[in-house]
Amino acid sequence: MKVTNQMQIDLPLAVWLLQDGYKSGADVAPPGELLSVTSLMKPTRQQILQRKVDMTQETIDVSEMVSQRMGHSLHDSIERAWTEGNWQAAMRKLHYPQSIIDKIRINPPMDKPLEDGIIPIYLEQRGFKKFQDIILTGQLDFLIGSSYRDFKSTSTFSYTSRSRDESFMLQGSLYRFIFP
């Protein structure tokens, strides 16, 4: 894809906007045809057109990447708060009892049983689920115990009109299928 900078966005911001931290999971996926939750949710027409369009001939201005990068930054910041930050002190400030804080484990192995009473918190974990001849994959935002959270940065219109609620619920349901 060709990139322009028609808005003359300053170099530090432009470089940040052009970062793509997406990892499909293909390198660690089990054998089979891989299909992501987000791809599965796209309209059929969009999926067909994406395969027909030569992306090397398409052009995008770096200014069009702001909302996408802001959403990605929100996810990164939340993840870092739990993996690199002092989440224990933050929970104490929020008046959580120390007995609860002591039970929390961040990203414990999903394939091993947890000790009784442990509260697992999983952040940005990718999962795979075989379904017939495909491998469905998705990366959840935040799972605390068995309660799933998905962080969205969306337009005011989408929020107030609730126009994307069904899509958000479907995404959550598919993640629940992958991460039972």
Question: Which positions does each model-derived feature cover?
Answer:
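Broad hydrophobic/π-residue packing in well-ordered secondary structure
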Residues: 47-49, 151, 168, 175
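Acidic active-site catalytic centers that drive phospho-/nucleotidyl reactions
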Residues: 141, 150, 171
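Short beta-strand-loop-alpha-helix junction that forms the active-site gateway
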Residues: 151-163
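Secondary-structure boundary elements
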Residues: 144-148, 177-180
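Metal-dependent nuclease catalytic cores in nucleic-acid-processing enzymes
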Residues: 76-82, 161-180
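Metal-dependent nuclease catalytic cores that hydrolyze phosphodiester bonds in DNA/RNA
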Residues: 1-147, 159-161
